[in-house]
């Protein structure tokens, strides 16, 4: 899908036209050496979700950087157009070109806007590590994405925490940034992966390329499994492992280091059944890429059969269209039908200030007794409500607002979260 061109100055304007619509540029989300990403919203359609505008070749980029930006755009566009339709891969809405001058085109991708990244989740975990529910959710979603793109012949080649983002609308993690991706058997990128998440064979290939030498073999989809193994180990341990995986100790016996990390965590919380995760991670981190477990096979790990429950921190950090309000109703309201109906109506009226409420549930019995579940039409309204309702006073009590998985809510599964 191609859009019409338009002219920009040194900074993007507040509004731009693409695909026959007017878009408002609201804020910059991030920038790198060859691209910047902005939050945009379609004007005249307040119900439409915001998007992410990825602009390659920012103003002032010339020479090798300009060539790299153009190359990255072509790589990412080709991969995303081929891989569209999978729930764990970022959605591409369209492609268009803007012009700073007649000879300086700037390519743009319009993508779905996603939420928190795994990198941010690791920061929030404060070196304690993520919950097993979070790790399982992330591992399954990323493996589903990898199984699909590997089946299509693609290698992502830059899997890292910053490139795994949560989708509030789809309630899953998604892969982004396919600028280094390549077709297996046709590796046209010399330097792949990010330091700390780079597979041994990619490390060797990069070193040879820097020395002007050609590698005998190309990297395969196994490099993505290595990266995921490191990511999962970081999520479990709460530690960045860049220096660990480059150490001589790791190269001598990585299995023993993984065992030590899991043993140390078990001392803190002996109730965590973590050995299946340990074995899964080990199967991804073989130095020999031919021994690494493929993504499709990894999805059959016993780790994914364990029914973990989320911690309350998980439900605060991962937005969904469903809001859960705690500390609102006490037993007196639940046991008096008239008072119960009055307070439920009051809560619904307050929640509707932030967007259309699809449904509202206040269970009188466990599980979920006294909790308020509010389903909004979209996650944007739910996020606004969560931000503004948390800490509010209701009937003399401070309200605690978390999100809640829409899939579980629809099934009537009101599990007890862990503190």
Swiss-Prot record:
One Pfam match: Pkinase
Tissue specificity field: Widely expressed, with highest levels in skeletal muscle, kidney, placenta and peripheral blood leukocytes.
InterPro entries per the UniProt record, alphabetical: Kinase-like_dom_sf (IPR011009), Nucleotide-bd_a/b_plait_sf (IPR012677), Prot_kinase_dom (IPR000719), RBD_domain_sf (IPR035979), RRM_dom (IPR000504), UHMK1 (IPR034372)
Catalytic activity: L-seryl-[protein] + ATP = O-phospho-L-seryl-[protein] + ADP + H(+); L-threonyl-[protein] + ATP = O-phospho-L-threonyl-[protein] + ADP + H(+)
Superkingdom of origin: Eukaryota
One GO cellular component term noted in the UniProt record for this chain: neuronal ribonucleoprotein granule
Catalytic-site annotation from UniProt: 158
Binding site for ATP: 29-37, 54
MF terms in GO: ATP binding; protein serine kinase activity; protein serine/threonine kinase activity; ribonucleoprotein complex binding; RNA binding
Domain Protein kinase: 23-304
EC number(s) stated in the UniProt entry for this protein: 2.7.11.1
Keywords: ATP-binding, Kinase, Nucleotide-binding, Nucleus, RNA-binding, Serine/threonine-protein kinase, Transferase
Keyword Metal-binding: no
Subcellular location per the Swiss-Prot or TrEMBL entry: Nucleus
Domain RRM span(s) in chain numbering: 324-406
GO BP term, example: positive regulation of translational initiation
Record-linked SUPFAM superfamilies: Protein kinase-like (PK-like), RNA-binding domain, RBD
Predominant location category: nucleus
Subunit annotation: Interacts with stathmin and CDKN1B/p27Kip1. Interacts with PAM.
Protein family per UniProt: Belongs to the protein kinase superfamily. Ser/Thr protein kinase family.
Task of the protein: Upon serum stimulation, phosphorylates CDKN1B/p27Kip1, thus controlling CDKN1B subcellular location and cell cycle progression in G1 phase. May be involved in trafficking and/or processing of RNA.
Protein name in UniProt: Serine/threonine-protein kinase Kist
């Amino acid at each position: 899908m191609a859009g019409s061109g338009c002219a920009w100055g040194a900074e993007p304007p507040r509004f731009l036209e693409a695909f026959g619509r007017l878009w408002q540029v609201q804020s910059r989300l991030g920038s790198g050496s060859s691209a910047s990403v902005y939050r945009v919203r379609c004007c005249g359609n307040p119900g439409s979700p915001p998007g992410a505008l990825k602009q390659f070749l920012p103003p002032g980029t010339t020479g090798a950087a300009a060539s790299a930006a153009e190359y990255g755009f072509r790589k990412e566009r080709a991969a995303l157009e081929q891989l569209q339709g999978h729930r764990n891969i970022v959605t591409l809405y369209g492609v268009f070109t803007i012009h700073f001058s007649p000879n300086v085109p700037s390519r743009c991708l319009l993508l779905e806007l996603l939420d928190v990244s795994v990198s941010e989740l690791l920061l929030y975990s404060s070196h304690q590590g993520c919950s097993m529910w979070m790790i399982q959710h992330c591992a399954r979603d990323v493996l589903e994405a990898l199984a699909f793109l590997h089946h299509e012949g693609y290698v992502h080649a830059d899997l890292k925490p910053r490139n795994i983002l949560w989708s509030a609308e789809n309630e899953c993690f998604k892969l982004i940034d396919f600028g280094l991706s390549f077709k297996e058997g046709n590796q046209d990128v010399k330097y792949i992966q990010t330091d700390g998440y780079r597979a041994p064979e990619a490390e060797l290939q990069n070193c040879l390329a820097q020395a002007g030498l050609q590698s005998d073999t190309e990297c395969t989809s196994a490099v993505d499994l290595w990266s995921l193994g490191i990511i999962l180990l970081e999520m479990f341990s709460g530690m960045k492992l860049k220096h660990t995986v480059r150490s001589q100790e790791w190269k001598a016996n990585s299995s023993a280091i993984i065992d030590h990390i899991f043993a140390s965590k078990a001392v803190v919380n002996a109730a965590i059944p973590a050995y299946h995760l340990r074995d899964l991670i080990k199967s991804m981190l073989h130095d020999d890429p031919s021994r690494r477990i493929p993504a499709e096979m990894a999805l059959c790990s016993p780790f994914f059969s364990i029914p973990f429950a989320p911690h309350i921190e998980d439900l605060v950090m991962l937005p969904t269209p469903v809001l859960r309000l705690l500390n609102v109703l006490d037993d007196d309201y639940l046991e008096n039908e008239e008072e119960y109906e009055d307070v439920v109506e009051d809560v619904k009226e307050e929640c509707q200030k932030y967007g259309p409420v699809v449904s509202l549930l206040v269970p009188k019995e466990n599980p979920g007794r006294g909790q308020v579940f509010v389903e909004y039409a979209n996650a944007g309204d739910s996020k606004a409500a969560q931000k503004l309702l948390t800490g509010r006073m209701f009937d003399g009590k401070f309200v605690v607002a978390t999100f809640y998985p829409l899939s579980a809510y629809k099934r009537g599964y009101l599990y007890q979260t862990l503190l």
